[in-house]
């Protein structure tokens, strides 16, 4: 009975964590084009315009959620993710739309001011560019 209660509690906690993930619309139709919003062609423009109600919030309101690499199996496809490299786990770096994980990185859709939306792999272990290191991505919560 005790084992059952512990298992049930873990399932509920896991579901709560997934429920906090901010879902995004399928970004694949936008490949090769920029998604432009108040943040112009920056990475956050894609995420703010295509994910939940993020356009209503500045990045300063974003909260670091689940670590993508550690929780890959439970993060839904097309979830808003970002790096939170500022002190206090505040957003700084890069934002993208999560697709899936691979053994050597994460597959995302992203853009930045020099590159329109594309599907690409952000590899783990890129210590030279922490904002492009798959180890540093977390789900975005509000």
Swiss-Prot record:
It comes from the Eukaryota. GO terms for biological process: defense response to bacterium; innate immune response. Its main location: secreted. The lineage of its organism: Eukaryota, Metazoa, Ecdysozoa, Arthropoda, Chelicerata. One of its GO terms (cellular component) is extracellular region. Disruption phenotype: Feeding interruption, and proliferation of bacteria in ticks. Acquired via bacteria-to-eukarya horizontal gene transfer events. Bacterial type VI secretion amidase effector 2 genes (tae2, AC P0DW66) have been transferred to eukaryotes on at least six occasions. This is Domesticated amidase effector 2. It is found in: Secreted. Its EC number is 3.4.-.-. Induction: By feeding (in both nymph and adult stages). Is responsive to IFN-gamma acquired in the blood meal from mice infected with the bacteria B.burgdorferi, leading to induction of antimicrobial responses. The keyword Hydrolase applies. Keywords: Antibiotic, Antimicrobial, Hydrolase, Immunity, Innate immunity, Secreted, Signal. The active site is at 43, 94. The keyword Ion transport does not apply. Detected in salivary glands and in the gut (at protein level). May be post-translationally modified, since the saliva wild-type protein is slightly heavier than the recombinant one. Belongs to the cell wall amidase Dae2/Tae2-like family. Tick gut and saliva antibacterial peptide that directly antagonizes host skin commensals which enter the ticks during feeding. Acts as a cell wall hydrolase that cleaves the bond between gamma-D-glutamate-meso-diaminopimelate of a peptide stem and D-alanine of another peptide stem in peptidoglycans. In vitro, degrades peptidoglycans from both Gram-negative and Gram-positive bacteria. Is not able to traverse the protective outer membrane of Gram-negative bacteria. Is not able to kill Borrelia burgdorferi, one of the Lyme disease-causing bacteria. Residues 1-35 form the signal peptide. One of its GO terms (molecular function) is hydrolase activity.
